[in-house]
Amino acid sequence: MPSFTRLATAAVHLGLLAQSAFAKPYHREDPKLGAVASESSVCSEIGIDVLKKGGNAADALVATQFCIGVIGMYHSGIGGGGFMLVRSCEGKYEFIDFRETAPAAAFQDMYNNNTALSLYGGLASGVPGELRGLERLHKNYGSLPWKELVMPAVKVARYGFKVTEDLVHYMETTTPSNKFLTDDPTWAIDFAPHGYLVKLGETITRKRYADTLETIANDGPDAFYTGPIAEATIAALTKQNGTMTLEDLKNYTVAIRKPSEITYRGYKLTGTSAPSGGIVTLSTLNIVNGYEDFGDPAAINLTTHRLDEAMRFAYGQRSELGDPLFVEGLDAYQASILSNKTAAEVRSKISDFRTLNVSAYDPEGFESLPTPGTSHIVAADKSGLAISVTTTINLLFGSQLMVPETGVIMNDEMNDFSIPNSSNAFGYIPSPANYIRPGKRPLSSISPVIAESPDGKLYLVIGSAGGSRIITATIQNIHHVIDQDMTVPEALAQPRLHDQLSPNQVSFEYAYDNSTVAFMASLGHNVTWVAPGQSTAQGLRLLPNGTFEAGGEPRQHNSGGFAI
């Protein structure tokens, strides 16, 4: 009998999500040691192996994250950054912001004449923070040696891994009009070693990246921020007109911020604060917390409308958010957003009979920032230590700049800033609170959440990838688990809706109930249908009997949630 639980790893095809398309679990009868879930079953297994060897959830998370940077390089890697929420075994929370920062030479109008420069090439990258984030987690919470946690990813990169359905999908999504994976020699070494793009089932290696990770395994994260690796990074960026310097890399530090929290149906929900999207997630849930029978199947149509309206108001609140170091009064504003008074005021504005004009949601300078190149991981252990983390290089394959000597894929996070007098590449209105400043961190939709049961014990660790859809996916998954008493795999398999206020429409995955969508249309919502897979979540739960369950995103072919 296998020694771990595997849940929710089956592929989802268009329109089939309503059949709860997750794999039948196979498991040990008593998985009480811990759990890991990520977008790669290979990487989740590495995390589980760490738990087997006596490591804790922090160790498992670090090992899993390094592996994701190898296999899920289109989403994540040490050339990017992210946000991490940690619950200690004593029940204390820490929000580690390792988001990329604008280089010292960055300025507000740097992309006014060519917004494409914020997407591709040397000017598109913020200073990477992933390694400093993992370093902080390991130093404060880890138990096994750093090298022991990095080396599994080194082996995967050096000796290769199978080209999966997910990798094929993301390569095909990226390359129809841009053949950089095959035409750029720096990329082709890995992605087209035989003159053609690697195919499903073939083995792909990333040997330069393996060497880089091995150096970091031996010498620690400083090896990335100073010395030959740093020099190669800056040289590659400079060659493509970048202005990042060795000083920018050397001076990067994580920001430790105050987490945000609400009480929802008696459960304590802890999330992240600005510049992440955690406030929007918790604000939505705080608004609907005032509705009775929110999980009643008989009221599903009205519940869907109310949830969507709460999302729209919360996205309107988002327009004033940014980096707290650069936006005056943000702490007080965030506190007011999550107050019960504000939630009640919003509920009083929500009509059960119609949706409202966009202006009613107060979207001053509203901007939404899709970030498709994101990856989420959750990990927890029997002590109650739990981590929910989302990492990103922004767009798929980041800035499409790989450092030739190191194999590091650089982010294009600078596009997440607002550009004055110009909508960003996705057509959204600029938000002054999110204008570029040297050292500033751009606004994000990333929203990791950890829930405690009414008795104060760890209950749910959840989060999502998928740009602006991160927020709405996380909201719905929490709603399914807490209001509708679903397991994590069941919750992840439910069809999702998404409404970010701008554009003024609500999208439904193909499997969503037709009668509910018709009801929404009858209230004036602009409804549209989308294929599943635009948001990808991972989650785990600690049950009252002390056993864990975990779920990988069923919209991804190769995700994996495991418990041991």
Please annotate each region the language model reported.
Residues 1-23:
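Fungal secretory targeting signals
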Residues 195, 290-393, 405-406, 413, ...:
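Internal maturation/activation junctions in enzymes
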Residues 24-45, 49, 55-219, 224-226, ...:
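Noncatalytic scaffold domains of N-terminal-nucleophile
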Residues 70-95, 243-245, 386-454, 484, ...:
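Active-site rim segments in enzyme catalytic domains, especially the processed small/beta chain
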Residues 256, 371-374, 396, 444-446:
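Short, small/polar residue-rich loop motifs at catalytic or cofactor-binding pockets
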Residues 76-77, 81-88, 375-380, 448-451, ...:
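Short beta-strand scaffold segments in enzyme catalytic cores
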Residues 324, 420, 440, 474-475, ...:
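Extended C-terminal subregions enriched in glycine
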